[in-house]
Amino acid sequence: MNQSLLSQFGTSEERVKRAIEAFKRGNGVLVLDDEDRENEGDLIFPAETITVEQMAKLIRYGSGIVCLCITDELCQQLDLSPMVQNNTSINQTAFTVSIEAAQGVSTGVSAQDRVTTIQAAIADNAKPQDLSRPGHVFPLRAKKGGVLARRGHTEAAVDLASWAGHKPAGVICEITNDDGSMARTPEIVEFGKKFNYPVVTIEDLVRYASNK
């Protein structure tokens, strides 16, 4: 990871603390994973507080695949089965079946509809019948143990939400460049400065979690 670029966002510990503070306020955070993994940056918001405006930003600047990162317990509560029985994904990304709110949405694609779906999924007494399948929100099952168990954006989202005092759920989307290519560290740093988002790495989060 290009530490010289990241140093403008503080030390590793400072970057994590700023990310947690942003989450506490319901703001977004940019999370970079390892260069030898996906080498991508995701914009992540706490699911509990995500707004239509924030969702619109994810859709506009991201890949369009908006994912809801949740715990295994919530997946079981909602009866969300894996998207496939045999996961051959290189990074073992744990997609479940996609979802839509059973009520209060039209086509399910708009920013408002996706926020409605997320709110339905993470509601305190959410039930399987509160969701239709398939839909336009893609749940991801976080590994128990968070980033210490798997160095993924999924686990980063759930950990950040928990550390900030929110429900353990986050909304993520990979940031793309204007030409459709994936944004790497230099572009993510510029994006963070432009929109005033903290930038943190998975390695930062692992270090922080190890010392908790």
UniProtKB/Swiss-Prot annotation:
Mg(2+) 1 binds at E38. Homodimer. The keyword Magnesium applies. Pathway: Cofactor biosynthesis; riboflavin biosynthesis; 2-hydroxy-3-oxobutyl phosphate from D-ribulose 5-phosphate: step 1/1. It comes from Histophilus somni (strain 129Pt) (Haemophilus somnus). This is 3,4-dihydroxy-2-butanone 4-phosphate synthase. GO terms for cellular component: cytosol. It comes from the Bacteria. Its cofactor is Mg(2+); Mn(2+). Binds 2 divalent metal cations per subunit. Magnesium or manganese. It holds the Pfam family DHBP_synthase. GO terms for biological process: riboflavin biosynthetic process.
